[in-house]
């Protein structure tokens, strides 16, 4: 069931997430897998739900000259990302809620997201994927490191235990969806080379590219 709620608008919830982000099991493995799919010559990069800018900063390590656009709607996250990129004139942090249509920002060689899109309703997820396809340049790449639904309740409980959480401690703004449905959507929208490139329990890297 979709909870029409996103706790990250509150500073308390956003700060709690940031304090725990580095301890998410296997997160760095997923990020490393994502980086392998990002072209070294990418010129424009869009980061959806940037949080404190961690993923975009990783992408830019080997792409210093790339222009980065980072979207988020949490004042706490926007402030953190702004501070992270304060000395990088090629990065712009924009206040934007992913529940709303993407703003007109031009075309991008790469669109990335990390643990953000799963907060949207399923209908909005699919619509957002369509918008992502539209803003990708020919040959562009989309990579989404995401929190996805487990295929069974037992596996979901195992994932929660790995985080040291009980079912009552789950993020009420989560709206998890299985990998297979999202991959099907991407294929239907016209993405090529669609796959789940990496996965550990409920953490998955999904994506594809646009024809040249």
Description of each model-found segment:
Residues 113-117, 145:
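Residues lining the SAM
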Residues 145-189, 194-196:
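C-terminal alpha-helical "lid/dimerization" subdomain adjacent to the S-adenosyl-L-methionine
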Residues 42-43:
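Nucleotide donor/acceptor-binding cores
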Residues 46, 52-100:
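Class I SAM-dependent methyltransferase SAM/SAH-binding core
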Residues 126-138:
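A short glycine-rich, Lys/Arg-flanked "PGG" loop and its adjoining helix->strand segment in the class I
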Residues 103-111:
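A short acidic, Gly/Pro-enriched loop at the edge of an enzyme's catalytic core
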Residues 189-212:
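Core SAM-dependent methyltransferase catalytic element
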Residues 1-39, 54:
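Conserved class I S-adenosyl-L-methionine
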């Amino acid at each position: 069931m979709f909870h029409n709620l996103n706790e990250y608008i509150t500073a308390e919830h956003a700060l709690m997430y940031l304090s725990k982000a580095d301890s998410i099991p296997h997160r760095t493995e997923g990020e490393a897998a994502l980086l392998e799919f990002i072209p070294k010559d990418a010129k424009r990069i869009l980061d959806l739900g940037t949080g404190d800018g961690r993923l975009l900063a990783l992408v830019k390590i080997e792409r210093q000259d790339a222009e980065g656009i980072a979207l988020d709607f949490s004042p706490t996250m926007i402030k953190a990302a702004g501070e992270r990129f304060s000395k990088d004139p090629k990065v712009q942090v924009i206040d934007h809620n992913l529940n709303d249509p993407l703003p007109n920002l031009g075309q991008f060689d790469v669109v990335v997201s990390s643990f953000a899109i799963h907060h949207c309703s399923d209908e909005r997820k699919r619509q957002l994927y369509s918008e992502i396809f539209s803003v990708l340049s020919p040959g562009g790449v989309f990579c989404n490191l995401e929190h996805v639904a487990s295929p069974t309740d037992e596996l979901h409980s195992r994932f929660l235990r790995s985080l040291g959480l009980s079912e009552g401690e789950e993020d009420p703004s989560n709206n998890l969806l299985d990998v297979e449905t999202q991959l099907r959507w991407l294929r239907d929208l016209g993405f090529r080379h669609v796959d789940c490139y990496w996965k550990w329990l409920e953490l998955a890297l999904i994506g594809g590219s646009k024809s040249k």
